[in-house]
Amino acid sequence: MESESHWLWLFNTESGKLSVKLSDTDVFDTPYKPSQLVNIHFNEQMMDIEDATTFQIVSETLEAYPADKMPCAPQNAALNATAWCRFGRPQMPQSWHFQKSDISEWPLERRLCELNSGFDQGLFLILDTDDEFATCLLLSEGMQLSAIKSLRQYHVIKVTLNRLLPATVDLALSAQSNWGQQLA
């Protein structure tokens, strides 16, 4: 992914596309519809320091995992996460799509989770949490929520904390680390 020193947010009112201009030749389109976004009344806007910080944190978080364990490129996920954090419309929780977990408290340092709809299970990046809710971005290629509803990759959903499941990739890496320590 090529980049210049200043990335720009682009919003095309005709196509309804929010994009990031990374260089003169490289533009990254986000999957979000105008109805999912707020504060998009511009054609071109520079990314600010908060955007850069969000991008950096998400990139570093996802790059810490083996590439073969991640269903998407860390930079693509980071760009979409940054776009959502900046322009995403606040959501009402949609916890009813997902099965409850047995976890009473979610560790703040845990940034990946899984959600299970009973139809499908997906890997998510936790964008933010409060005492009750988590806003999660789907990293998996897609996820079936019900017989008639699905989520596409990089779409965001808000759920209660009691729906979050530990990410299988975290459990596998933890087990691998424990085995390595026992063998040493």
Curated annotation (Swiss-Prot):
Domain of life: Bacteria
Assembly and interaction partners: Interacts directly with FtsZ.
Function: Contributes to the efficiency of the cell division process by stabilizing the polymeric form of the cell division protein FtsZ. Acts by promoting interactions between FtsZ protofilaments and suppressing the GTPase activity of FtsZ.
Lineage of the organism: Bacteria, Pseudomonadati, Pseudomonadota, Gammaproteobacteria, Alteromonadales
Gene field: zapC
Protein name: Cell division protein ZapC
Main location as per UniProt: cytoplasm
Family under the similarity heading: Belongs to the ZapC family.
Gene Ontology biological process terms in this record: division septum assembly; FtsZ-dependent cytokinesis
Subcellular location: Cytoplasm
Species this protein is from: Idiomarina loihiensis (strain ATCC BAA-735 / DSM 15497 / L2-TR)
